């Protein structure tokens, strides 16, 4: 058995091996003859959490901790809880010999921890562990070459990633491993000029052995191109990295979705509720149980009545606070529990219910065989009878709605058809909106020899008394625009409000064009029915009525006098912005920052309402948001039927628009449309708002856009946008749909920003010089008709303000 002196010698040897630069701490000289000594080695990096724990026995009377022979005391970083010591944010001074002495009747047992804290340099890119070794091998290879060699890149595969986007306060490391004979020199340039340590706060470190530069705690002023210049007498080579520093945006605590989760357990069980909290500022976490007093769950102040079950103490870690332990639960414990987390920015909370049931019997009563067999027979018989009834009902329904056969010539319409219209709703909808409804009754034959629906009036629609409006009280006016299958004209409706029968209301009337097809009629009816089911909201275009009897179908909707949001913003650009505009039509309206945030807030409210009705828009953009006379934002075209399964998104169509630059990657590549894909489009719409109607991804061809999106690139921050709003855009553009915010969260955040924004905050709308720099030749005419515009359209938009087709210095994009 090893003696005490042998153990001391072994501990000193371990410490000398771990830290050659530090004097090896020695063990205490005086130890009880009965003492048992153990030594454990422990290595950690700078900034890590040190955790040292003693092994305890049942008969331990007391525990003492020492470091390098001195009693260990608690500090703001050091916490001692009996048999455990925790040191937060470890530094090199925390290295040493820690001793845990447990006193027992049989003697003292001492455990030594030889701790070594070493420095660690994080890097933007993952360097191989053998950087030092490879550098040595390169130099040996260079020196062994008899002939001179010009500089060359030793590991070009490690230099492929040129754009680096990192959060502020991170450490950045760029490497340019090179070789040559004689050994070349290394210099670093920033923005094409020599980069010296005094050019940035905190300087930088150059490690010539690994051909690298290291910058600690980067700040936004560190953005820019960094060039490594490698040269010797026989040549020179260089490589440029682009650094982008993203500022952190403070936010209230974020709680992981689905936690804590509802639980159902037998009485007497143990329950753990888990709550994952993410927060930059230090969060304060509490666990609450909702209670009732005199049958009420709320106090006189209207706030819920709660009992604090767990709160953070002086020595409690966040990890401990994220779990609530309930032991041996009873029926009285069955109630609602809440995890409440707050920081200096705000408060977040998630709740879960605990259900306690009777304990499951260990010996359940087993059915006798005859009874069990009888139940199976009855259930099987009932199932077969139900299947037969369902089959008969479906067969009769098909016969009732069956279309009459056409002749071989499709140009002759035999009869008016019943259109089974399928609603556009999200996949999780369980409402009746997902069912097919027959909206058109058969009528007499049409004598038309045209494949177009010239006899529109011969299609009889069932009258809906809630929405039917008399034709003789509707006056049609000038055209407002044309769509794929119909047109919109201005109109005046007399007595639209039944309480004011003589009042004239300006409206917009949707109708079919003269060359409309049967599918066009089906689409218009589908849009009308969708608007009926969705209902009314201030921030969507609402259905006001319809003329379905004794004539062509007219769908009456709200009129927005100021046009779509894209043109509304462009018309309010000041003359100083670089785009072709007509000075005669420049509006005198001044837009404040609060006006732009209000636009975004109203659109978010409209989309929140549509999402609550299980409606997926699929084409949210500034061109599909209309503006009323009172500058109220109203979302349009949410009821359109869009065929998303037969569109080639990589090609232009003759009359169709492909909104690829607004589409989420999962919609673009996999054709998966959800509320979260609408959130991506909302992020692009935010970018449109704060560029006053700019075209997304300016100057980027669509084929290149597909590649950039897959690589994680995103658009730059607009010049007049705050960091908080830009971070909101970036959240909307998260590659993982489930990580994007919901419209409810967007409404809450924008509501807060609107409330905190002053009305007098007018924008400095002069575009910065470096916001767009020439990247593609400018071949504009007086009107925009680019095939590379943000929406693919065969026909140009007349009199449309044009933005220069410029590209940012790095492609106008950032990588997430």
From Swiss-Prot:
Residues 25-118, 156-244, 253-355 form the Ig-like C2-type domain. The active site is at residue 619. Residues 24-374 are extracellular. GO terms for molecular function: ATP binding; fibroblast growth factor binding; fibroblast growth factor receptor activity. Residues 133-143 have a biased composition (Basic and acidic residues). Residues 396-816 are cytoplasmic. Residues 1-23 form the signal peptide. Residues 474-763 form the Protein kinase domain. The modification Phosphotyrosine is found at residues 459, 579, 581, 649-650, 726, 762. Glycans are attached at residues 76, 116, 238, 262, 294, 315, 328. GO terms for cellular component: cytoplasmic vesicle; cytosol; nucleus; plasma membrane; receptor complex. Its main location: membrane. Disulfide bonds join 54-100, 176-228, 275-339. Residues 118-152, 776-816 are annotated as: Disordered. Autophosphorylated. Binding of FGF family members together with heparan sulfate proteoglycan or heparin promotes receptor dimerization and autophosphorylation on tyrosine residues. Autophosphorylation occurs in trans between the two FGFR molecules present in the dimer and proceeds in a highly ordered manner. Phosphotyrosine residues provide docking sites for interacting proteins and so are crucial for FGFR1 function and its regulation. It is an enzyme of class 2 (transferase). Keywords: ATP-binding, Cell membrane, Cytoplasm, Cytoplasmic vesicle, Disulfide bond, Glycoprotein, Immunoglobulin domain, Kinase, Membrane, Nucleotide-binding, Nucleus, Phosphoprotein, Receptor, Repeat, Signal, Transferase, Transmembrane, Transmembrane helix, Tyrosine-protein kinase, Ubl conjugation. ATP binds at residues 480-486, 510, 558-560, 564, 623, 637. GO terms for biological process: animal organ development; cell differentiation; positive regulation of cell differentiation; positive regulation of cell population proliferation; positive regulation of macromolecule metabolic process; regulation of primary metabolic process. The chain crosses the membrane at residues 375-395. Residues 779-788 have a biased composition (Polar residues). Belongs to the protein kinase superfamily. Tyr protein kinase family. Fibroblast growth factor receptor subfamily. Monomer. Homodimer after ligand binding. Tyrosine-protein kinase that acts as a cell-surface receptor for fibroblast growth factors and plays an essential role in the regulation of embryonic development, cell proliferation, differentiation and migration. Required for normal mesoderm patterning and normal skeletogenesis. Phosphorylates PLCG1, FRS2, GAB1 and SHB. Ligand binding leads to the activation of several signaling cascades. Activation of PLCG1 leads to the production of the cellular signaling molecules diacylglycerol and inositol-1,4,5-trisphosphate. PANTHER family: FIBROBLAST GROWTH FACTOR RECEPTOR 1 (PTHR24416:SF131), TYROSINE-PROTEIN KINASE RECEPTOR (PTHR24416). This is Fibroblast growth factor receptor 1. It comes from Pleurodeles waltl.
